[in-house]
């Protein structure tokens, strides 16, 4: 089994557990160049809030879009957008990525900005 298949298997298992809880989830995805975050409704069919380093306003503020500072900025922004929509409690879905580096930085900054998970 290759690296990507293993990550997808881990993500599927975690998403199944989150679906049983019927919780709103904060989904994180990372690529070598960008970091993405979405708050998804419990039914899985609606994106409530989204933020990523692809957004022009974010890219202009940051020197690099693929480091921990960029992930922290995205975490703060996604928390602000979710709280604006009335979402304060979420389940953290790391999409099979290790809770380390950019994923951990995004999670910590979202917690500091007011999201609870």
UniProtKB/Swiss-Prot annotation:
This is one of the proteins that bind and probably mediate the attachment of the 5S RNA into the large ribosomal subunit, where it forms part of the central protuberance. This is Large ribosomal subunit protein uL18. GO terms for cellular component: cytosolic large ribosomal subunit. One of its GO terms (biological process) is translation. Part of the 50S ribosomal subunit; part of the 5S rRNA/L5/L18/L25 subcomplex. Contacts the 5S and 23S rRNAs. GO terms for molecular function: 5S rRNA binding; structural constituent of ribosome. It comes from Aliivibrio fischeri (strain ATCC 700601 / ES114) (Vibrio fischeri). Pfam families: Ribosomal_L18p. The lineage of its organism: Bacteria, Pseudomonadati, Pseudomonadota, Gammaproteobacteria, Vibrionales. The gene is rplR. The keyword Transmembrane does not apply.
